[in-house]
A protein has these predicted regions:
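P-loop NTP-binding core
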Residues: 1-274
Length: 274
């Protein structure tokens, strides 16, 4: 793969499986021999915690320091702040200090592209960079969308989650118009799906009908599972925790869909260049 693809995993609603998806998709891609960097762009540090760093506030270098260096135009040494996870992915961690970055960005030069500046510098080392976005529509998520090639939107199949999707679509469209014209939506991913309930089935069917013509809805659905919830904070992916379970199978399937998307894009690029 010649180019590094940057994917923002985003939804302004919390608790929809963003962090779990970022970690497991990233590790799924690493299992397919892709070089992967995961960026925790959420001040709660959920991705950092879930990958086995229980005290993110004690880490010497986090995304906040990296972004501050970009703002100050200070050189960033190769590999600075990057942690190597046992399942083959790299992590740029975050902690509560990132909440102050929102305020600092307001007065920064080229404030929307601070994260993009850093990502462009590390792109040559990776095939995929996945960003776990903050659940808001502030300056940090805008930085993530400005840096991304595409967006994956995890969403629970509930009416409240569905209502929030339209607002998120408007924000993505605005970033695309004003800051990052190449930004596209890879798809909506249904997470925490309890297929036993009729409500979930009805909402999924109506959302597939509503968005399906304009926006891809991934064929893979991530099922609700107590075992998946247990992995959070253990520092392991679902593959290491329960490799034969239904959630691991679903994330393997999602990984295949994401890789196939890239193959189609690559084929289209080659055909267009002929």
């Amino acid at each position: 793969m010649a180019n590094c693809k940057v994917i923002a995993v985003t939804n302004q609603k919390g608790g929809v499986g963003k962090t779990t998806t970022t970690a497991n998709l990233g590790i799924g891609l690493a299992q397919q021999n892709k070089r992967v960097l995961l960026i925790d762009a959420d001040a709660q540090g959920s991705l950092t915690l879930s990958l086995g760093y229980p005290k993110p506030d004690e880490l010497p270098v986090t995304l906040t320091d990296i972004m501050q260096n970009v703002i100050n135009d200070t050189p960033i040494p190769d590999g600075c702040g990057i942690l190597h996870h046992g399942e083959g992915v790299d992590l740029l961690p975050a902690n509560i200090e990132l909440s102050g970055m929102e305020i600092r960005l307001i007065n920064a030069m080229s404030r929307e592209s601070v994260l993009r500046t850093y990502i462009n510098a590390v792109k040559p080392h990776y095939d995929y960079i996945l960003i776990d976005c903050m659940p808001s529509l502030g300056m940090m998520p805008i930085n993530s969308l400005a840096a991304a090639d595409s967006v994956i939107i995890p969403s629970q199949p509930s009416f409240l989650s569905a209502k929030g999707l339209d607002l998120l679509m408007q924000s993505i469209a605005k970033v695309k118009r004003q800051i990052n014209p190449k930004l596209k939506i890879d798809g909506i991913l249904f997470t925490m799906v309890d297929s036993r309930t009729n409500e979930a089935k009805e909402i999924i069917a109506s959302l597939r009908a509503h968005y399906g013509e304009k926006i891809r809805v991934f064929g893979t659905e991530i099922p609700f599972s107590v075992r998946a919830a247990e992995t959070s904070g253990r520092g392991k992916s679902i593959f290491a925790h329960d490799k034969n379970g239904k959630v691991a199978a679903a994330y393997r399937s999602l990984t295949k869909e994401v890789l196939e998307l890239e193959r189609k894009t690559e084929r289209f690029r080659v055909d267009a260049a002929r």
